[in-house]
Amino acid sequence: MANLRKTHPLLKIANDALVDLPTPSNISAWWNFGSLLGLCLISQILTGLFLAMHYTSDISTAFSSVAHICRDVNYGWLIRNLHANGASFFFICLYLHIARGLYYGSYLYKETWNIGVVLFLLVMMTAFVGYVLPWGQMSFWGATVITNLLSAVPYVGNSLVQWIWGGFSVDNATLTRFFAFHFLFPFVVAGATMLHLLFLHETGSNNPVGLNSDADKIPFHPYFSYKDLLGFIIMLTALTMLALFYPNLLGDPDNFTPANPMVTPPHIKPEWYFLFAYAILRSIPNKLGGVLALLSSILVLMVVPILHTSKQRGLTFRPASQLLFWILVADMLVLTWIGGMPVEHPYIIIGQVASVLYFSLFLVLNPLVGWLENKVMNW
């Protein structure tokens, strides 16, 4: 008789995704980040749910409700620290997952890649509205600055901003709707993740050499289920250590001050995982131009498959393109550093050079070097 796990309509879906999935035998630890992102999403939804049970989305009580969670709710401090630092781990895994895709040419699975970019944007939106909820100084001013960027949209900009605010400034209506969005979006992300996996399983996973691996596939379980489990243990250990020993390491001290529309903090900046995009935004001395650059810094990922010129898929055997990849990594780190610095000399020019290099790498240098490597192979 056939196994229930292979015949039951529901179990069959789980089986095809997690048990009997044919997987390339040579995928490395860089392929662990997809499942780690799934774990991040689940842990964020769970900790977020417990926080939402005690949080109030009203400007008069939001800040004190977060303090109440940390002081008076059983293990509330732990749940809050896991949730806040879980966001950082979410983005660390995201950036490493995207970097893996860029390095090994996984972006040639176009549907999977584009849904991934949409997922990235959704997670960024979720993190942004979530950062506003504690209603500290940086929450309030971050919300003010970032929502204000929409006023750069020609003709409808100002109406758009006031529509999102629900008034003429960031106020109670804004906080209430941001809480609603922050509760909703993770479930949208979970739905989009299902699509991401659906399209991935149409083609199967890529692998480090970028060749067809049909001749050498192994079942996902037990091999990769245990490999993923090891990744889970490492990440959860790191997250727990950060949440218990250094819970405020990545936060902004300004957010321990309740929001005050009358006092502007000396340096308004987002959480560390948005600093690279913030640096690109600030490097253009024009509002609309900055907003377009900010959007393009993420959407440029969508044109990567179109601009792939090499005959080889990944960078495993392409040293010149590898050099460009690591320059991109260094450039991202420089942009992250600049995003947290004040707008003054020499940071302005460093940010502008790094921003130009960022787009040049994606749009000009990588396609050019891929084309040159083809020439060298023929020669």
UniProtKB/Swiss-Prot annotation:
The subcellular localization recorded is: Mitochondrion inner membrane
**More info:** Heme 1 (or BL or b562) is low-potential and absorbs at about 562 nm, and heme 2 (or BH or b566) is high-potential and absorbs at about 566 nm.
Q: CDD domains annotated for this entry? A: cytochrome_b_C, Cytochrome_b_N
State the similarity comment. Answer: Belongs to the cytochrome b family.
* Subunit organization: The cytochrome bc1 complex contains 3 respiratory subunits (MT-CYB, CYC1 and UQCRFS1), 2 core proteins (UQCRC1 and UQCRC2) and probably 6 low-molecular weight proteins.
Q: Which residues cross the membrane?
A: 33-53, 77-98, 113-133, 178-198, 226-246, 288-308, 320-340, 347-367
GO function terms (MF aspect): metal ion binding; ubiquinol-cytochrome-c reductase activity
GO biological processes = mitochondrial electron transport, ubiquinol to cytochrome c
The annotated topology with respect to the bilayer is: Multi-pass membrane protein
Which keywords does this chain's UniProt record carry? Electron transport, Heme, Iron, Membrane, Metal-binding, Mitochondrion, Mitochondrion inner membrane, Respiratory chain, Transmembrane, Transmembrane helix, Transport, Ubiquinone
Q: Where does heme b b562 bind?
A: 83, 182
> Which cofactor is essential here?
heme b
Record-listed a ubiquinone binding positions: 201
Pfam families given in the database record = Cytochrom_B_C, Cytochrome_B
**Main location per the UniProt record:** mitochondrion
- Can you quote a single GO CC term? mitochondrial inner membrane
Ligand binding (heme b b566):
97, 196
- Recorded protein name is Cytochrome b
What's this chain's function?
Answer: Component of the ubiquinol-cytochrome c reductase complex (complex III or cytochrome b-c1 complex) that is part of the mitochondrial respiratory chain. The b-c1 complex mediates electron transfer from ubiquinol to cytochrome c. Contributes to the generation of a proton gradient across the mitochondrial membrane that is then used for ATP synthesis.
What does the record's cofactor remark say about binding? Answer: Binds 2 heme b groups non-covalently.
**What sections of the sequence does the record tag as coiled-coil?**
none
